Amino acid sequence: MTAMHENQPPVQAGPVRRLTADDTEGVLRIVDLEELDSANLARELACPDDYMWMGVDLPEGRLGAVHRSMRWGDHLLLKGVFVDEPLRGSGAALQLAFALRDTARAEGYEGLAAWVEPHKPEAALAHMLRLRSTGPLVHRFDVPLPADGPYAVAATARSNGRLVMEPVTSAPPLVADLLTGDAPGSVRWVHDRHRLVLSGFPAASVTDLGQVLAAAAPLAKAVGTRRVELPVPAADLSAAFFLASLKAHRLSRTPVRLGRADFGSTRPGHAAREPKEQVRA
């Protein structure tokens, strides 16, 4: 990456464009994400209905900034912006964020979603995108699936969908679906690199984790992952200790909230899509 000289005006980014397989080398040069290799990137770039990669170029034509997002239920989940050194301070991150919002609206998404750490810089961007806090403060845990277990294999799992788990008790879920507030036991899922990401914790207690993993395992196995990401209330210290004992990995040091911006009624000609996969466990 090239350093900018002091007192030199910021480099102006080119127009926002949708990225394709031809941008693979440029993306991997800028984006540093665990488990995002050329194979995972190729899979996402080949599924524009499920993953939205957008970027802007430097004046010489080289990729200068990238934003990654994905379909999660009927919302576009913003996963992160990566800006090369020459474009830092240019407003490229904000340019990409607003372009993603406009594209999502035009393509029939019901809104935007993003995990927001309240006291981090991204909270300001979330405010500019009018993302409103949804649900409790949570910690996101990356939980390994047990190596064994009588797991059925989901027949045609794709990149996202809906998982319905029969409630173990009549008690409410530990974290209700943060995207829709659907009936207990129903959550949205999306395939994010090496893990399956759930939009809630559909069981009543963290001690019911085994049932949740058993329900998610067929999907995870079908898409080639061995880990599941789950939100757990940040105030539930016993849940955090329980998950730590299972070698679950907490994805951020401080709690996060799901920020959500709903577009309102779907635009004419862009009907909301049904989830590609609905699996009942």
Give the ranges of each region predicted by the language model.
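Conserved GNAT acetyl-CoA-binding A-motif
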Residues: 104-117, 222-232
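C-terminal "cap" of GNAT-fold acetyltransferases
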Residues: 132, 138-166, 249-281
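Conserved active-site alpha-helix within GNAT-family acetyltransferase domains
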Residues: 118-136, 234-252
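Active-site rim helix/loop that mediates acceptor-substrate recognition in acyltransferases
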Residues: 3-5, 31-59, 162-183
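Conserved acetyl-CoA binding element of GNAT-fold acetyltransferases
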Residues: 74-85, 192-207, 231, 256
